Swiss-Prot record:
SMART domains: Arg_tRNA_synt_N (SM01016), DALR_1 (SM00836). Its EC number is 6.1.1.19. GO terms for molecular function: arginine-tRNA ligase activity; ATP binding. It holds the Pfam family Arg_tRNA_synt_N. InterPro entries: Arg-tRNA-ligase, Arg-tRNA-synth_N, Arg-tRNA-synth_N_sf, ArgRS_core, DALR_anticod-bd, Rossmann-like_a/b/a_fold, tRNAsynth_Ia_anticodon-bd. Monomer. This is Arginine--tRNA ligase. The keyword Nucleus does not apply. HAMAP family: Arg_tRNA_synth (MF_00123).
């Protein structure tokens, strides 16, 4: 039980009109620590108690009694709690030194499944920085949900079907070179894709030709299928190399094509339930009662099925296959209307589990303020970007620690971690401007800054040859260590908030705060000097390292022992 829960529990025992959960939501952290560690505002009780909030606060303060509090005072309408530093620090250090990386593990999920639809790049197109957001947010959410007791299923819903394959087949047949594609598949296919789009703007017949080839593909034409399979296989080899670089794994690569034979069943169910209406020759589902103006277009007038039909088939398949408790789609915010339609159609079909589906949108990555576009060839490709980040990290590591043995390995962890961390520290729904120099900096709110704080602590622990005792009698009561203790104690709640809001940035910001607090402590405290507090200071350093490493792991970022 953390201190906020303890305070809420104590207050609930003497307040009749509010339960523990309601009290917990009202608790605040005073901006000035001189006003206490936690405050309870008594305003909400004034109406029920028919007393002034100041009087209520004074009465509550008088009744509070626990050894976890140094003192409890009423200041105006607030009850201010000053926690007993020695007691709380002893509890926190005991918990972390005993539980180690399992500190803050929870069993909220009871091993139920969370399906995460993430990454999902388009076949035959390069893996750009735009795809990175879905990949790293999804991967981090997977770690976060596992930490609180869920099992996760990471699905890479590949964009491996659609008219773009008609375009690619036409381009390849006109200008393609088999050897060049084999040597550099994505580069060559991108050149072909950009070229056919540029030429189609002046020559509409190319569009018609592409549609014709896609029709052939849908009808199982041998040549079209062979080219499609080849484009898919070559792209996947390249994608998997990048996923290995990012240390991201998937449980399923079932993409759009996987659902080709599963969509008719969806149309049949909609038809049987009387949900399909005809509109200008097309078949649609009316969703006005859900406040959605545009109907869901299920089948076009030429009989072709649409994106939503495929996603309905995927949702039904995943529910049947994984019996999920939650199904999360980590997809850009421009798809918000689509996912509202998807949930509404599933609701119309009578599936209560549509409530368990969540669209987790995210903002755009720009370069110098400009939007990125594959079609126009204006992209930041991930592979050369990772190589550049690793190279920049290595230069800084060589300057800081020329004797370091495994420089390349550490530079890779720092370079890749820098890109991931920068993305994840940004509030998910905000975009950000891609700035490699800022990402790889060891100063400021960056991944390398947090990694370096962790490596510095490991260096201190090695010098002291410190091994924590699970029954160690550790406790501290100074102001600098108290800031760190409060953060470490808050870690379980931070993880819950990140899960509840599908927001890894909560953990990234926490990691920055913890690293900053420790660096401040390190600057003011002679940790290694002989003193009665030496072991407790080392235990605090150890606990900080454990929590920093775990916070980074939840973001999919490595924590090198030396830097």
């Amino acid at each position: 039980m953390n201190t906020k829960e303890l305070i809420a529990s104590e207050l609930a025992s003497i307040i009749d009109s509010l339960d523990q959960e309601a009290i917990l939501k009202l608790l605040e952290t005073p901006k000035n620590s001189e006003m206490g560690d936690i405050a309870f505002p008594a305003f909400s009780l004034a109406k029920v108690e028919r007393k002034a909030p100041q009087m209520i606060a004074a009465e509550l303060a008088e009744k509070m009694n626990s050894q976890a509090f140094e003192k409890v005072v009423a200041t105006g309408p607030y009850v201010n709690f000053f926690l007993d530093k020695s007691t709380i620090s002893a509890q926190v250090l005991q918990a972390v030194t005993t539980e180690k990386e399992h500190y803050a593990d929870q069993n909220i999920g009871k091993q139920e499944n969370v399906v995460i639809d993430m990454s999902s790049p388009n076949i035959a197109k390069p893996f750009s920085i735009g795809h990175l957001r879905s990949t790293v947010i999804g991967d981090s959410l997977s770690h976060i949900f596992q930490k609180i007791g869920y099992q996760t299923v990471k699905v890479n819903h590949l964009g491996d079907w659609g008219k773009q394959f008609g375009m690619l087949i036409v381009a390849y047949k006109k200008w393609g070179d088999e050897e060049a594609v084999k040597a550099h598949p994505i580069d060559e296919l991108l050149k072909l894709y950009v070229r056919i789009n540029a030429e189609a703007e002046n020559d509409p017949s190319l569009d018609e030709e592409a549609r014709e080839w896609f029709r052939k593909l849908e009808n199982g034409d041998e040549e079209a299928l062979a080219l499609w399979q080849w484009f898919r296989d070559e792209s996947l080899v390249e994608f998997n190399r990048l996923y290995n670089e990012l240390k991201v794994e998937f449980d399923s690569y079932n993409g759009e094509a996987f659902y080709n034979d599963k969509m008719d069943a969806v149309v049949d169910i909609l038809s049987e339930k009387g949900l399909l209406l005809e509109s200008e020759g097309a078949q649609v589902v009316n969703l006005e009662k859900y406040g959605i103006e545009h109907p869901a277009l299920i089948k076009k007038s030429d009989g072709a099925t649409l994106y939503i039909t495929r996603d309905l088939a995927a949702a039904l398949y995943r529910k049947n296959e994984y019996q999920f408790a939650k199904s999360i789609y980590v997809v850009g915010q421009e798809q918000s209307a689509h996912f509202k339609q998807l949930k509404a159609v599933l609701q119309e079909m009578g599936y209560d589990w549509s409530d368990d589906i969540t669209h987790v949108p995210f903002g755009l990555v720009t370069k110098e303020g400009k939007k990125l576009s594959t079609r126009k060839g204006n992209v930041i490709l991930l592979e050369p970007t990772v190589a550049e980040a690793v190279s920049r990290a290595k230069v800084q590591i060589e300057a800081k620690n020329p004797e370091l043995e495994n420089k390349d390995q550490v530079a890779h962890a720092v370079g890749v971690g820098a890109i991931k961390f920068y993305d994840l520290k940004t509030d998910r729904t905000n975009g950000y401007d891609f700035d490699l120099e800022a990402m790889v900096s060891f100063e400021g709110e960056t991944g390398p800054y947090v990694q370096y704080a962790y490596a510095r602590i490991q260096s201190i622990l090695r010098k002291a040859d410190f091994k924590p005792e699970t029954a160690g009698n550790y406790s501290l009561n100074d102001t600098e260590s108290w800031e760190i203790i409060k953060l470490i104690q808050d870690f379980p709640r931070i993880i819950n908030r990140a899960a509840d809001n599908f927001e890894p940035s909560i953990i990234a910001k926490f990691a920055i705060s913890l690293a900053q607090s420790f660096n401040k402590y390190y600057a003011h405290t002679r940790i290694l000097d002989e003193s009665p507090e030496r072991d407790s200071r080392l235990a605090l350093s150890y606990a900080t390292a454990v929590v920093l490493k775990e916070a980074l792991r939840l973001l999919g970022v490595e924590a090198p022992e030396k830097m």
